[in-house]
Structures are given as C-alpha cells and as structure tokens.
C-alpha cells in the first residue's frame, strides 16, 4: 500500500471557520495586503509556517505537567541536555526561546572570536542557503551572508535528489575570494528551506566539513529540520538505506562543530530553540555570557521548565520513522496533486512544504512586483488559505546599495504544520489552485506603502498595482 494514513489518533480538535469572500477582501485590505498581518481567526487553513504550529503528543502534554520552574538548575534542563547528548552527540547545550535566539547569541561571539584571532576585517558567513532570520542576524552584526547552493536547486522542474547541497567548487572559490580569515563560519542548513525544503546529502556535508577544517573555519549546522533531512538520506543516499534515522542523525552532526536549532519545527514544540556545541567548552562559555542578558539564565534561556521537558520528549518523537514516513508522504501527496493539476512546483517536494513556482505560473509579474506574494493574496481571497512568499520580498534589499537583491526563485511556500491537517485539507488546497488557475493572467503585482529596513516581509504593507 502506497498511502500512509496518519500514525496517530486525534484526541482533541480545534474548530476552524470558513469566512466569506467579502470578509476576506476586507481583512486583506486591513492587513495591507500582507497575510502575515491577518488575524488567525480570518484564516481557514493556515500554511504560513511549520514553526511552532504543530500538534504536541500526549507524552509531551504529560511532560508539560512535570515542569520544574526553578530559575536555576531546572531538572527539565538536565533532561534536555541528556537528550541532546544521547541523540545528537553534542556535550554542551544552551536552551533559547527559539532559533533566532540561538543566532543572536552565537553569531556575534563567533565574529568577536575571529577578530581576536586577527581576522574578520570583512566578515562573511557562507551557507548553502541562509534563511531570512539567519541572514538578518549575520547582517545586523556587520557581516555578509553568501549562499552557494547547487545550481540544480534553481531548476524547479527537474528531479534531483539533493537540491540542498553546497556547490563545492563555488564554496572553495568563495573562501579563496574573501580569504579564510574573513570567513567567520560555514552554515550548513538542513533541510535547505529557501531552495524548497530540499535535503543535503551526507557526502556533501562531509565534503563541506573537510574543506572547513582545511581552512580552520567552524561549521554551524542550522538544524530546524534535521529529522526530515535524515529521512531523505535514508531513502535516497546509497549505503544508508539500512541505517536508522537515529544513526544517520548522529553521523550528520559529526560534520559540524555546533548547532543552532529552531525547535519549533522537527522537535514538535510550540516554542523553543537550542544552541549546542560538540566539544568546544571555551566557546560554549563565551556564548553563555551573552545568553544571560539576551535570553535568560543559562539553564532556561527564555523557556519555562515545562517547555524544555516537551522539547526533550519531542527531540526523540521527531525521529520516529513511522511518523517521518507519514510526514514526508503528506507533503509529497499535496505536491503530486498540484503537479497533476498543472501547477508548477519545486520538484521533487521537500520535507516540510510544497513550493509553487510563481515565476513560471505568473510570468507577467516581474520579481520587483513580488509574484509569489501576489499569488499568496489571491489564494487567500479564493479559499481562506494563508501561505508565504519565498522570493524577492523575503530576500530584501542589499544593505549597502539599498537595491533589491535579485532572487533566483519566486516561490510560494505551502507549509504543512506537523500532525495538524489531514489529506482532506490538502485536497481542498488543490481545488483552490484549480479554481484560481483560470484567472492567473488577471493577477496584479504589488508595491509598498510601508517598507521596514530589516526583515521587511513580516510587517510591510503593500497595495496592488493598478
């Protein structure tokens, strides 16, 4: 049997309400044509993000009741540290309120360390593909974010197993161009969100790590979707088909020195993050000094004890192979149905979302008028479905020139929350696209009425171009 049903029983439900077209038009106008600013009650199916939007298990809810809310030395912190060491193999753990909390205490410490060694006169971070908040933290600290993902990622119509891989030649060229002394860190993003939730192979992770070690550059693994990446390795990479996901995860983290993690994704919690170190106690201690004023005391990092307990449990649940098979299958189900309906997507589908290629679907709208965001708005008006643009709007402007950064792709991300929606919901999404497809030529681009200078896509306000 190819179909994989939900590997869980539903114990509690939350009612959702379908709005009228007139209600949606009014809500979108009041939100400045930015679905980020819509109230959730105005949304029928919410595919904005998989971050913190999943459903926790009965075991996680039981863990919530075991929260130790001591300011210092919570037992839940020690349980979390033990789980990180057991499952990932890293010795030192700092909890944070979410992934960007880890970035805001780690990145400036890495830059300061590099400068203390006589480098980082023109600091850069290199990644397969920085996500938006990661790039923002790099740039806010005066460094430059450089992406060197494989060019195969930009051909959305052609199948390739590893569209999250680094372009190894481009990585070496970039290090040589900027000088190893200026490369603060290499960030390996698993899976690679901005290229379509696409996996990176273990062979590529290993090659990147070996290059980094040759130049004495630390490797940070951006770990939001590490379980999904491990599942793809098990399914696609030769020699790993008989390895367990847990074994693959352990090997993945051998090719990094530290990690940042938004635990709101694969570890299945609503809030939380991690900043962990394999064996560098000195760096761990330096970062902890930033944790106290920025996130909170080092044994809670902005989290309640109950949330750390749910996270410790979720780290293991996220590696469950029955769950991962269902999870990846549901994403593929939506993607395959959209392709059958003639909707172009990033192919093959990735781990957490289906990415519609708005550049192909709306060729009449140029990148600077945000075709994927325009499609996002139309999908909401059509069916009450909220999704998110991954393209020119998200990429933003060059901080030095103020000009729009050229985006290689204009994608609409249909992000599926974990253990929340059934395939009936996915069928509804497909039907909305089929209905919407008929009026694609009439969709107009957008322009700003308010544009923030940093991470503009979150709170920008726009209007349709007449």
UniProtKB/Swiss-Prot annotation:
Key words, A-Z: Lyase, Pyridoxal phosphate, Tryptophan catabolism
S-S pairs: none
Listed Gene3D superfamilies: Aspartate Aminotransferase, domain 1, Type I PLP-dependent aspartate aminotransferase-like (Major domain)
Coiled coil, from the record: none
EC annotation from Swiss-Prot or TrEMBL: 4.1.99.1
Cofactor: pyridoxal 5'-phosphate
Catalytic activity: L-tryptophan + H2O = indole + pyruvate + NH4(+)
Modified residues (N6-(pyridoxal phosphate)lysine): 265
GO MF entries: tryptophanase activity
Enzyme class (EC, first level): lyase
Keyword Lyase: yes
Chain segments annotated as transmembrane: none
Entry-linked PROSITE patterns: BETA_ELIM_LYASE
Pfam families: Beta_elim_lyase
Stored InterPro entries: ArAA_b-elim_lyase/Thr_aldolase, Beta-eliminating_lyase, PyrdxlP-dep_Trfase, PyrdxlP-dep_Trfase_major, PyrdxlP-dep_Trfase_small, TNase, Tryptophanase_CS
This protein's pathway: Amino-acid degradation; L-tryptophan degradation via pyruvate pathway; indole and pyruvate from L-tryptophan: step 1/1
Keyword tRNA processing attached: no
PANTHER family, alphabetized: BETA-ELIMINATING LYASE-LIKE PROTEIN-RELATED, TRYPTOPHANASE
HAMAP family (alphabetical): Tryptophanase
Family as reported in the entry's similarity comment: Belongs to the beta-eliminating lyase family.
NCBIfam families with a match to the protein in the record: PRK13238.1 (NF009709), tnaA_trp_ase (TIGR02617)
Assembly, per entry: Homotetramer.
Name the UniProt record assigns to this protein: Tryptophanase
Native source species: Photorhabdus laumondii subsp. laumondii (strain DSM 15139 / CIP 105565 / TT01)
Name of encoding gene: tnaA
């Amino acid at each position: 049997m190819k179909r994989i049903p939900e590997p869980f029983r539903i114990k509690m439900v939350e009612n959702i309400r379908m709005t009228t077209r007139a209600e949606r038009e009014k809500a979108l106008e009041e939100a400045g044509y930015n679905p980020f600013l819509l109230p959730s009650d105005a949304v029928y199916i919410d595919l904005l993000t998989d971050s913190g939007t999943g459903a926790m298990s009965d075991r996680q809810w039981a863990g919530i009741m075991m929260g130790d809310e001591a300011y210092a030395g919570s037992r839940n912190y020690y349980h979390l540290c033990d789980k990180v060491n057991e499952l990932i193999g890293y010795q030192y753990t700092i909890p944070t309120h979410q992934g960007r909390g880890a970035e805001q205490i780690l990145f400036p410490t890495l830059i300061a360390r590099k400068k203390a060694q006589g480098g980082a006169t023109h600091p850069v971070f290199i990644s397969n593909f920085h996500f938006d908040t990661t790039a923002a933290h790099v740039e806010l600290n005066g460094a430059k974010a450089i992406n060197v993902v494989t060019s195969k990622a930009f051909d959305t119509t052609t199948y390739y197993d590893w569209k999250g891989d680094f372009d190894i030649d481009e990585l070496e060229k970039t290090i040589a161009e900027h000088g190893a002394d200026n490369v603060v860190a290499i960030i390996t993003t698993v899976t690679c969100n901005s290229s379509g939730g696409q996996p990176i192979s273990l062979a590529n992770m290993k090659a990147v790590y070996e290059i980094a070690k040759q130049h004495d550059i630390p490797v940070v693994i951006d770990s939001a979707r590490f379980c999904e990446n491990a599942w793809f390795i098990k399914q696609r990479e030769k020699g790993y088909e008989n390895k367990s996901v847990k074994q693959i995860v352990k090997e993945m983290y051998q090719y990094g020195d530290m990690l940042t993690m938004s635990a709101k994704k694969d570890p299945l919690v609503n809030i939380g993050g991690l900043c962990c170190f394999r064996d560098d106690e000195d760096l761990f201690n330096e970062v902890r000094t930033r944790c106290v004023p920025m996130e909170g005391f080092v044994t809670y990092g902005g989290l309640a004890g109950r949330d750390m307990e749910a996270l410790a449990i979720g780290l293991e649940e996220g590696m469950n192979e029955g769950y991962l098979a269902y999870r990846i299958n549901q994403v593929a189900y939506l993607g395959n149905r959209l392709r059958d309906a003639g909707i172009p997507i990033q192919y093959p589908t990735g781990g957490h979302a289906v990415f519609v290629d708005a550049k192909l679907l709306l060729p009449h709208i140029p990148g600077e008028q945000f075709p994927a965001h325009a499609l996002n708005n139309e999908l909401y008006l059509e069916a009450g479905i909220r999704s998110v643009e991954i393209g020119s709007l998200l990429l933003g402007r060059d901080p030095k020139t103020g000009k729009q950064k050229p985006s290689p792709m204009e994608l609409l991300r249909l992000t599926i929350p974990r253990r929340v929606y059934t395939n009936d919901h996915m069928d509804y999404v497909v039907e909305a696209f089929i209905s919407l497809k008929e009026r694609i030529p009439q969709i107009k681009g957008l322009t700003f009425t308010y544009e923030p200078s940093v991470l503009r896509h979150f709170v920008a306000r726009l209007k349709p171009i007449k």
